[in-house]
Amino acid sequence: MKIVVAGGGYAGLSCLMEIADRLPDAERVLVDPSRWHLRQTRLQEALRRSLDGLRTPFSELGDQYGFRHVRASPSLSRKALARASAAGRLAGEGIDEDFDALVVAVGLRPRPRPRQARWVGLADLKGTDGRRLVRRIIEEAGGPSDRVTIVGGGATGLQYLFELRDALRREGAKTRLALVDPGRRLLPGQPDEFHAYVAERMEQSGITYLGGYGLASAGDGELELKGRQGGVRRLRSAFSFSFTGMKGLSL
């Protein structure tokens, strides 16, 4: 039996490991255009160490868990998957693999960020040296009157917020920081005490917290925020990050 898994993120690798346990004799193939798996939940660590430390080559993982990696990015549209299913073969640029079962594990992508030059999103951080990014922020927005804004107060946004603050302070930057989040409180799935603790930490760290506001539009160095209860607020921001969650892949 031959099983092809498309997508080398956490879901795809978990699937391959589960298959290895349940069907150890099956031939297993991973299809992903990258050379390595990137631990996205720890991207904030790249602000203080090399991004290479968060990457594991698929070749090493394949040796460890018994699968073969094919670097390719075939179409996974509804029509392409229907053709592949009927033929029992996944074909496209860089790949031509028959299969008995095909698993598609590429369902989530970061929501797009505003296109202005001083905006960074999760997709950008996957290939960005964090320490160089800190130096860029200091060069372009390192003064006490400048502000760096994190839009999105989920787990990733919060981790990045505090890690970025520490990285800027280590370099002596006086840049102010702000967090913008549309929710009434942070991480609503957690107890109320968690929100209170994080809000207190932000206050102690001099971070401006704008809860109940979402991003309406982004201009040159200025954000237009829309409140949950109505009203519009404008915020000067010399550099901004977008951590507004993930969206599903349309098949």
Positions of predicted regions on the chain:
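Short, surface-exposed alpha-helical segments at coil->helix boundaries
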Residues: L51-T56, R131, D192-A199
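Rossmann-like NAD(P)H-binding beta-loop-alpha module
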Residues: L133-L177
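A short acidic Gly-Thr/Ser loop motif
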Residues: G9, G154, T244-G245
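A Rossmann-like FAD-binding core segment of flavoenzymes
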Residues: D25, H69-R71, L76, R169-L251
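Localized chelating/binding microdomains
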Residues: I3-A6, Y10, S14-E18, L23-A26, ...
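Beta1-alpha1 glycine-rich phosphate/pyrophosphate-binding loop at the start
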Residues: M1-R68, L158-Q190
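FAD-binding core/adjacent interface of flavoenzyme oxidoreductases
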Residues: G66-R147, G230, F241-F243
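Short acidic/His/Gly/Ser-rich catalytic and metal-binding motifs that mark active-site loops
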Residues: H37-Q40, R111-P114, S250
